[in-house]
Amino acid sequence: MDVHMVDQVLARYKCGSNTAVRFKLVQCHKDILDNGKEFHPSFSHQFFGDKSILTAMNISAFYSARYDLHLYYHGGSLLTYMGLKHDGEVNSKVVDGVQPDPVLSVIAEKYPAGCMTNLDEFIAKLPEEAKFMPMGELLHSYKCNDTEYEIYKADVTTPRLKDYHERLQTFLLFEKRKEAGDTHYSIVGYMTVYQYYAYPDKIRPRISQMLILPPFQKQGHGAQLLLTVDKFYVQDPQVLDITVEDPSYDFMRLRDYVDALRCRDLSVFSPENIRNGFSDRMVAQARKELKINKVQCRRVYEILRLRVTDLSNAEEYKSFRLGVKNRLNVPFQKEKADIEKLKVLLKPEEFSATATLQSTQERIQYLDQLYQELEEHYKKTIERIAAV
């Protein structure tokens, strides 16, 4: 069989891994039967490679066009079941001996705490798993849609955390429900924070990971978790400020909202002070009172400045735009200065081969695009603040 024909045959037995993988958080047998509890991963390339396309899942046979990989977690303990469902099999000889992807073993490697593969045995364990209780120190509780939620802090010294951390990771947010007089916990999300040294005698916590599971997203849990973590570190005099490791766009939106909400009540961020421009006093008070670093403080200032800016007043609006664009232009000015240094150090042919600098017109267009995107983001943040 030629390569083209093999590709045509294989195409029937491929599907995107984001579609094939199906998660469920379950508490009892009926949850396993409830398709409404199912959700898919947003990203799976960490498991299957950048293409995130699955082919065969069995050494001797390919499964037919539909196959589903089920990953069920007990909502509290995260006891895990992994299973495969498919419509039928195709002999691998049909595709000229092309070897299948070892999907089950690939996933199993990512679960050091292990997975169950017998569904009946998994179901039989659920009543015992219902006795799960969160570990660590209770920091905060709140209600959302008549359901109670609790946030716990745990670290490497916390009993039971090591095994649990292998299944998840550590500021832990749980849903708390009562059924038939019994309390049941279900994991909602988590945040991992590492502490680094800050010269000369301080600590700088760095938020490394944050996740709110899909069934609980868009309900305000992310803001509750971040506010709780911020409050925890604000009380520690050893903490200089809080940073974030490589934040995603969604996390930046959340952080901007939470920090703007916190800063708007500080005297230094009063409308009068905001209109006078960004100041060192803002940086100092935001760091002292809320552990917000200078870079984030500037973003918060811009959000609150736009909030008090009369967009129908041409001069006010222009002043705001220029202030933001000047900040956005700083990296370009630094790049220009670096290019000038290279021009002195390198030979003409070396310089022309290594140095690239946008034209003034290109830079202006790019800055304008950056500004428009940022203003739109700031406006959405302001709308969310107004809704509180």
Write out the residue ranges for each language-model feature.
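A broad, structure-centric signal for solvent-exposed, well-ordered loop/edge residues
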Residues: 200, 214, 219-220, 251
